[in-house]
Amino acid sequence: MERVRFITHRGKRVLLIDHAGSTPDEIRRTMDEVERVVTSEPPNSLLTLSDFTGTEFDKTAADRMKVVAAKDRPHVRRAALVGAESIPDVYYHNLESFSARHFPKFKTREEALDWLTGEDTEAAAS
């Protein structure tokens, strides 16, 4: 299964970053691919959904995520997370702080996709 792939929801293209069940090593490898794909897209053009359901973290994986999130910021219009309960709070807060981005959390992919492709960005889950 490709961990980084484009899907369509409500006629809009969304980059799905599927970390579900990943180990820290897999997260680091996937983030290399995320950086390559996202930085090749036009500025402020991407909708991204990252699924962290059942993911294992360590500091090096979390550090790689925050660096890529900072580099990707100019290309991402909206980003959402699913399975964020797998991310230790300290890593989640460091991710947002370092990248100067907000990552709304959703319970399901469907909820996240509806928010990403909807017009109302104010109704984000937390």
Please provide the spans of the model-predicted regions.
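Amphipathic, Lys/Arg-enriched alpha-helical "gate/interface" segment within cytosolic domains
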Residues: M1-S126
